[in-house]
Amino acid sequence: MGAGGAFIGLGSGAVLANPLVKNNSISTKGEIWKWSKEAEYYVQTPRGPKCQLCPNECNVKEGEPGDCRTRVAENGKLYSIAYGNPCSANIDPIEKKPLYHFFPESRAFSVATAGCNLACLNCQNWQISQKSPKETRNYELMPNDLVRKASENNCQSIAYTYSEPIVFYEYMYDSAKLAKKQGIKNVMITAGYIKEQPLRNLCKYIDAANIDLKSFSNDIYMRLNAGGLETVLNTLKIMKEEGVWIEITNLIVPDWTDDMDMIEEMCNWLYDNGFDDTPIHFSRFTPMYKLKHLPPTPASKLKKAREIAFSAGLKYVYIGNLPGNEGEDTYCPNCKEKIINRRGFYITEKHITGNKCVHCGETIAGVWG
């Protein structure tokens, strides 16, 4: 992901010289405050500042960061130490997020800081998500520089991604606000574990999001991810209300989230709550982090989940991390013809004009540019 070096690697094989690179880890108190900002959401309590950004509601004591590792207390105030110091930056095809129905074939300038407010046993980016910005090698890339670099590299969007953008909320918010003024879109790839007020304020500047709906069981959410289901469902509803284009990812983890009855319940909930034209990506698990002992998701389970979703009335259902399968492609929900053919993150054939199927004229949900 290009973290920690003098260059940002691009998917095309090119490299981009990074502006204002700091190759050394930010390790001392004096240095870390350069990349800090007072947190937007917290209240004072007798036990110290209490974060109001996510449902964890950490009471942060001086010298002890919050669960996300990006919130620290100083003189009774709460600060984010994830501001202008991304540990990862890259230029990606928007399809990599994955966002299949949002400005297809466009480029996204992708950034992440260290930290996360969940603790997923299967995290694919645990090397940065389960660390503090004090522990990673970081770039210096303040919001105005981030927006400028996105523009210079012909990126139609900035993607807040890789780790969990909620924990670098202030950096994302300020960057997104500047980007919006410059006509650059903002997208976030998130687990959606955030409280309502900060989410609604953020949605003013976010154009699209991929929400990781990790399971449809609160018990599994707690044991697998250290989170909760209801908050994520509320995030989906709020972002839809606020006009953000949404796509959903559901990672099917063997022995954890591969119960087809649960997947059917999830798909029925999505349909019943107006998400029938929201693309859903069933993603293949690969052994990772604390679940290395599990096998990869069988292709048969991914295909079965796709069938269940279609049967529930969902219109755009994809399979991820399984190259060469028909679940990579987009089909018209009316005439059933293939209208977008993909190979990995790249489109090889397209039969859509504007937002219409060329075969039958059906409107295809999305933001097509």
Predicted regions and their residues:
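Short cysteine-rich clusters marking metal-coordination/redox-active sites
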Residues: C51-C54, C120, C332-C335, C357-C360
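A C-terminal junction/extension of Radical SAM enzymes
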Residues: L294-G344
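Conserved, mostly hydrophobic/aromatic
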Residues: C120, I211, V317
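Short linker/helix segments within small regulatory modules
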Residues: E62, F345-G354
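N-terminal [4Fe-4S]-dependent radical SAM core
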Residues: K29-K50, N56-A112, Q127, K338-I340
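Extended interfacial segments that mediate partner engagement and assembly in macromolecular machines
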Residues: L78-I166, M172-Y173
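N-terminal export signals
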Residues: M1-V21
